[in-house]
C-alpha cells in the first residue's frame, strides 16, 4: 500500500523557490507519540523520500505501534524536459517537497519499546538527506 503524498488541489500549481532561513517555530514538539525524529538541518524533503522512510519504519516495527508523519509535501518543484533550450517559460511540476527547517519533528512513534523505536528511526533517517536525532517525551530539547 503506497501512499502518494501530494496535495489533492492547489490554488497555484507552480510555486517559487523561496528561502529557507531560521529554525522551525511550529511542529517542534511531540504532539502524538512518545518517540520522534527531529530534523537538525534545513532541506526540501521529497514525497518519495518521506515514503521510503515510512516503509523503513513500518518494516521494522511489523504492525506494532502507531506512526504519525508530521510533514507534508505541499510545495511543487518544476523541471524542464531534457535537451530543452533555455527560456520559453517555467517548466511543469515534476515532484512535491516538504520544506523542513531545523527543529521540525518529522515522524512520531508510539506503542513500542524505546530500543525498537530508536532502531526504526535510525533506519528511516538513512533514507533522508538531512541529519536527524531521536527524541523522547522525557528528553525533549530545543534546537
UniProtKB/Swiss-Prot annotation:
Keywords: Ribonucleoprotein, Ribosomal protein, RNA-binding, rRNA-binding, tRNA-binding
Alphabetical GO biological process terms: translation
Pfam family, any one: Ribosomal_L16
Region: Disordered, residue numbers: 1-26
Recorded GO MF terms: rRNA binding; structural constituent of ribosome; tRNA binding
One Gene Ontology term, aspect cellular component: cytosolic large ribosomal subunit
Signal peptide: none
This protein's record includes keyword tRNA processing: no
InterPro entries attached to this UniProt entry: Ribosomal_uL16 (IPR047873), Ribosomal_uL16_bact-type (IPR000114), Ribosomal_uL16_CS (IPR020798), Ribosomal_uL16_dom (IPR016180), Ribosomal_uL16_sf (IPR036920)
Extent of Basic residues compositional bias: 8-20
Family of the protein in this entry: Belongs to the universal ribosomal protein uL16 family.
Its biological purpose: Binds 23S rRNA and is also seen to make contacts with the A and possibly P site tRNAs.
UniProt xrefs under PANTHER family: 50S/60S RIBOSOMAL PROTEIN L16, LARGE RIBOSOMAL SUBUNIT PROTEIN UL16M
Record text on subunit structure and interactions: Part of the 50S ribosomal subunit.
Stated name of the protein: Large ribosomal subunit protein uL16
Native source organism of the sequence: Methylacidiphilum infernorum (isolate V4)
Gene behind the chain: rplP
Amino acid at each position: 500500500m503506497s501512499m502518494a503524498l501530494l496535495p489533492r488541489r492547489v490554488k497555484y500549481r507552480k510555486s517559487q523557490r523561496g528561502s529557507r532561513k531560521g529554525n522551525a517555530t511550529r511542529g517542534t514538539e511531540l504532539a502524538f507519540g512518545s518517540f520522534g525524529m527531529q530534523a537538525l538541518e534545513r532541506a526540501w524533503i521529497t514525497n518519495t523520500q518521506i515514503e521510503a522512510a515510512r516503509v523503513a519504519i513500518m518494516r521494522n516495527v511489523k504492525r506494532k505501534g502507531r506512526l504519525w508523519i508530521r510533514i507534508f509535501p505541499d510545495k511543487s518543484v518544476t523541471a524542464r524536459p531534457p535537451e530543452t533550450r533555455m527560456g520559453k517559460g517555467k517548466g511543469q511540476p515534476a515532484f512535491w517537497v516538504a520544506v523542513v527547517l531545523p527543529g521540525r519533528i518529522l515522524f512520531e512513534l508510539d506503542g513500542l519499546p524505546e530500543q525498537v523505536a530508536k532502531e526504526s528511526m535510525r533506519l528511516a533517517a538513512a533514507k533522508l538527506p538531512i541529519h536527524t536525532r531521536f527524541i523522547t517525551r522525557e528528553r525533549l530539547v530545543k534546537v
